From Swiss-Prot:
Locations listed in the record: Cell inner membrane
Similarity section: Belongs to the major facilitator superfamily. TCR/Tet family.
Keyword vocabulary terms for this entry: Cell inner membrane, Cell membrane, Membrane, Transmembrane, Transmembrane helix, Transport
HAMAP family the record matches: MFS_MdtD (MF_01577)
Gene: mdtD
Topology in the lipid bilayer: Multi-pass membrane protein
Record-annotated membrane-spanning stretches: 12-32, 49-69, 77-97, 102-124, 138-158, 165-185, 197-217, 225-245, 263-283, 286-306, 342-362, 396-416, 431-451
Protein's name according to its UniProt entry: Putative multidrug resistance protein MdtD
Length: 471
């Protein structure tokens, strides 16, 4: 890294700032949701859509980001991503209704979807291959700091200013990043194949309408007939994509990917697994504030041990997987995460608040081990010519499953509770207890998928550096 030219190091800093903005925004909102609900005159049970609108937009737009960067140029697309993200942040802060906020979050999601993958592509183009891993470690480090600062910073801003400031802080950073991108980043382009627009639209429609239908009549205000229509449209769109992709070498995601058994199992497990674990970052600060009466800042601080546990476990997860094999690790961490979820609920309802940081630290460790294992299992056996496509599909599924998880968590709260819940009441705690029990059950279900993974430790080693560089 030290022998890189000055202009290359500046370009890496620009990418790192983009990673930081995107990762900070995924966590800073969570602790502000109850305050947003009060300010906008909405029930806290509806606020999960603030997260879903962002994450679902990222999932929908991800497949197009790499192609756009190759076609239009990495500088142009990265600049556009920062501008859209910054404008979305401004519109979020100016929103006076929930619907306005959801539209602004979707605009943020378009920028966020392009920022991270185009940033990775930029690093691949400006850094020699032998220094790629060191450069990626450098630019992704701020992305790890973002989730650490996000909850506490969000709580601090909400408690001592207002929720609008969790979006306003993005504006000066975004302006500086946009100017620096235009001045310092080269506009690399590559010859591209024809973009599969038909496949992209079919997948986008299928994902969006099915997630919207899952929110139910209470969340969307739609009639049962309209929701049934959405489900039908979504299913038809996905079936049409499968027919479109069959024997189509130019399909957005080739069906040849699923001939690799570990990819199929890993992708199915990642989808189901992240539905369950995607509920936790949303539900935990909401439960701490509405169910237990914590202040926004205190609730944000309570999330830090979970992030620390996750970061600490990444250092040894490869050794753990190589020692015990993917099947044992994934089944154990899936069931373990379910048990830790129950332990958190029990500890909180008993009033043992001093134990909660240790439980959340353990939750972060278990979750991190499972995430890393799921990712490497999914990609490790793919042939080199399918590695990039498989990585893109996995990234899309990760975002989609998290949006579905948050949607289901909001649906569970709506099923067990009324439209308005009061802070720190017995009824509210009962609602959260039933919701948490349901979440623990959902989190445990992917163990049935992971139990089918071959348990040959020598074959199921962590993904090689050669394949990582090919993605």
């Amino acid at each position: 890294m030290t022998d890189l030219p000055d202009n290359t190091r500046w370009q890496l800093w620009i990418v790192a700032f983009g990673f930081f903005m995107q990762s900070l925004d995924t966590t800073i909102v969570n602790t502000a949701l109850p305050s947003m609900a009060q300010s906008l005159g909405e029930s806290p049970l509806h606020m999960h859509m603030v997260i879903v609108s962002y994450v679902l937009t990222v999932a929908v737009m991800l497949p197009a980001s790499g192609w756009l960067a190759d076609k239009v140029g990495v500088r142009n697309i990265f600049f556009t991503a920062i501008v859209l993200f910054t404008l979305g942040s401004l519109f979020c802060a100016l929103s006076g209704t929930l619907n306005e906020l959801l539209l602004a979050r979707a605009l943020q999601g378009v920028g966020g979807a392009m920022m991270v993958p185009v940033g990775r592509l930029t690093v691949m183009k400006i850094v020699p291959r032998e220094q790629y891993m060191a450069a990626m470690t450098f630019v992704t480090l701020p992305g790890q700091v973002g989730p650490l600062l996000g909850p506490a910073l969000g709580g601090l801003l909400v408690e001592y200013a207002s929720w609008h400031w969790i979006f306003l802080i993005n504006i000066p950073v975004g302006i500086i990043g946009a100017i620096a991108t235009l001045m310092l980043m080269p506009n690399y382009t590559m010859q591209t194949r024809r973009f599969d627009l038909s496949g992209f639209l079919l997948l986008a429609i299928g994902m969006a309408v099915l997630t919207l239908a899952l929110d139910g009549s209470k969340g969307t205000g739609l009639s049962p007939l309209a929701i049934t229509g959405l489900v039908a449209v979504g299913v038809v769109a996905l079936v049409l994509y499968l027919l479109h992709a069959r024997n189509n070498n130019r399909a957005l995601f080739s069906l040849k990917l699923f001939r690799t058994r570990t990819f199929s199992l890993g992708l199915a497990g990642s989808f189901a697994g992240r539905i369950g674990s995607g509920m936790l970052p949303f539900m935990t600060p909401v439960f701490l504030q509405i169910g237990l009466g914590f202040s926004p800042f205190h609730a944000g601080l309570m999330m830090i041990p979970m992030v620390l546990g996750s970061m600490g476990m990444k250092r040894i997860v490869v050794q753990v997987v190589n020692r015990f094999g993917y099947r044992r690790v994934l089944v154990a961490t899936t069931l373990g995460l379910s048990l830790v979820t129950l332990l958190f609920m029990t500890t909180a309802l008993l009033g043992w608040y001093y134990v909660l940081p240790f439980v959340l630290f353990l939750q972060g460790m278990v979750n991190s081990t499972r995430f890393s294992s799921m990712n490497t299992l999914t990609l490790k056996d793919l042939p080199d010519n399918l590695a990039s496509s498989g990585n893109s599909l996995l990234s899309m599924i990760m975002q989609l499953s998290m949006s579905i998880g948050v949607t289901i968590a909001g649906l569970l709260l709506g099923l067990f509770g009324s439209q308005h819940v009061s802070v720190d009441s017995g009824t509210t705690q009962t609602v959260f207890m039933y919701t948490w029990l349901s979440m623990a059950f959902i989190i445990a279900l992917p163990a049935f998928i992971f139990a089918r993974v071959p348990n040959d430790t020598h074959q199921n080693v962590a993904i090689s550096r050669r394949k990582r560089s090919a993605q």
